[in-house]
């Protein structure tokens, strides 16, 4: 029955989208922890380019697990994914940091990747 195939396909797409969103959140959390431990790498206030940390760096330094590609298990989403941190004015003693996650998998690219 065609209906069953369509339902399964929609379910799989939803599961994949959830996996991508989870990876994006995990990447952001890993980058947050990385920069807590490496504050010297944080960008200057209002530097528009910010500082970039690669997913592979986060994996190599044990902040992040290997991210298997949900669409193709023989690939992963590690090599082209990264996080950019930018720094706005300090708020009291706290730094106002913004994290932009770029997750790149075989059939998915975060909207914040640009280009």
Give the predicted meaning of each segment.
Residues 1-15:
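C-terminal juxtamembrane segment of a hydrophobic transmembrane alpha-helix
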């Amino acid at each position: 029955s065609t209906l069953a195939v369509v339902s399964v396909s929609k379910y799989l797409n939803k599961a994949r989208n959830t996996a991508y969103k989870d990876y994006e959140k995990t990447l952001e959390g890993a980058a947050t922890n990385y920069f807590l431990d490496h504050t010297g790498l944080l960008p200057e206030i209002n530097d528009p380019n910010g500082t970039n940390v690669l997913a592979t760096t986060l994996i190599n330094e044990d902040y992040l697990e290997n991210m298997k590609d949900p669409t193709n298990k023989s690939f992963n989403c590690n090599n082209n994914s990264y996080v950019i941190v930018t720094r706005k004015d300090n708020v009291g003693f706290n730094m106002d940091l913004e994290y932009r996650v770029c997750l790149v998998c075989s059939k998915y690219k975060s909207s914040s990747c640009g280009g």
